[in-house]
UniProtKB/Swiss-Prot annotation:
Catalytic activity: L-aspartate + O2 = iminosuccinate + H2O2
Keywords: Cytoplasm, FAD, Flavoprotein, Nucleotide-binding, Oxidoreductase, Pyridine nucleotide biosynthesis
Molecular function GO labels: L-aspartate oxidase activity; nucleotide binding
Cofactor binding note from Swiss-Prot or TrEMBL: Binds 1 FAD per subunit.
Binding, FAD: 17-20, 46-53, 361, 377-378
NCBIfam families: nadB, PRK07512.1
Job of this protein: Catalyzes the oxidation of L-aspartate to iminoaspartate, the first step in the de novo biosynthesis of NAD(+).
PANTHER family hit by this protein: L-ASPARTATE OXIDASE, L-ASPARTATE OXIDASE, CHLOROPLASTIC
Residues with site note (Important in orienting the L-aspartate substrate): 118
Stated name of the protein: L-aspartate oxidase
Family, similarity comment: Belongs to the FAD-dependent oxidoreductase 2 family. NadB subfamily.
Annotated gene: nadB
Alphabetized Pfam families for the sequence: FAD_binding_2, Succ_DH_flav_C
Amino acid sequence: MAKIVDCFADRPIIVGSGLAGLIAALTISPEPSVLVTRSALGAETSSAWAQGGMSVSLSPDDNPSLHLADTLAAGDGLCDAVAAESIILEALDAFHVLQHFGIHFDQDSNGHLALGLEAAHSRRRIVHVGGDRSGTAIVQALTACVLNDPSITVLEGLEARHILMADNVVCGLLLANPTSEIVLPSSRILLATGGIGGLYDATTNPVNNFGQGIAMAARAGAVLADMEFVQFHPTALHCHNRPLALVSEAVRGEGAVLINERGERFMADIPGAELAARNIVAQAISAEITRGGQVFLDARQALGARFSTRFPTITALCHKVGIDPVHMPIPVCPAAHYHMGGIATDRQGRSSIPGLWVAGEAASTGLHGANRLASNSLLEAVVMGTRAARDITSHNTPHPLGTIPITPKKPDTTLIRPIVSQCLGVLRHAADMHRAIAALLPFVEGEEESSDPAIVALLIAIFAHLRTESRGAHARTDFPLKHDTTQRRNMTLEDVLEIAHSRIAQRKEKIS
């Protein structure tokens, strides 16, 4: 039986210690809060692994309108333009917030900010730290600030398993580790639980990040949005490791080119070439690999000996697998990298459930649309983590605890990953998605270790099945064209389960 811990009663609870969670905790301060993380503070987060940096218009030839135009173009018609504009207009504030917490962004030899160029950006607007160590440096600095803030209680080694509800509002959170189970009573929970890359064999995310926050919110009845849109980073370091190391877009921004095993530059005739939007590059690389080829990122001519100083982290990662990027092309492949979909939120990070806020990759704000513009994720994490935190401090209506359920088993993705990897990858087809739905539904309804990962996977499968077009990161070989008009889709888990049962019944009728 879970132990109720009353000493933190009604404090805001933040789940996750990536950029959004850390910023939220620091923003809520000096009001006391509790930050829950399943591992060490700041560890096992996608934020800490970010190489590129954060997008912000700072150069004389740039402005927020150009940044917005690039964001909307990458989003392929599905961005919420109002939400996107509001976030981008706060980019400069986000930049100053990070500076306030001790982050020193790279400068050029003249003492000016060094601005990087990444795919689908029309201007150099990526601020970075330590070359390609932006995420690590930012998370380390914010982690130190959190640990030095007496108003923030950090609970490490505890995994959020269930959002407790009473009368359709949040009343607490059930946490567990291998030796204990506890309940934190609270009417204010902020999920900053990251993405879903752990559902895939090939991912650049921490392998335990399968969308736990999405699964918990879905069980609680939250509205989900745009779940079909999974961004595959085009250039993960192709090797036998899991997760795969990221070879940042910034390498292509510095002039590196993509070649196949024959030395052909297959992106040369595609608009934008190597700096086309991520979905375009990922799909082109996937097509090369599908035909039995290999793909390499060649920086020898563009960077040469400068590679190791501009990209020290990538250099070290390459050396670990026997690649010298100064003298050798880097083998690359697409890998699940970022989820544009998630828990639907409003401008303040509120979900459809009273008492539940969401920030960072777990949320669907409308900024990214069908395809995220590079380095907009760190921007969104800072802006929305700040907004949600400020909104949380203006709400505090305690609710008594409802029924405490039996603690769900520790989630395990082992049986789900093969289904997702084979059926919901870069290129999709109705037949594969039908197989995924049929395979996932028993796991969803089985309430075993695979149940929560299966919920997230089923959400992706049903949303993808219903979008009968190719748009942004959602590419269907049976529907290769875009519709003239389109819209974002919002559904609950109840909606998705009803559709899943209906589709399976229809398939059985056709077979019989």
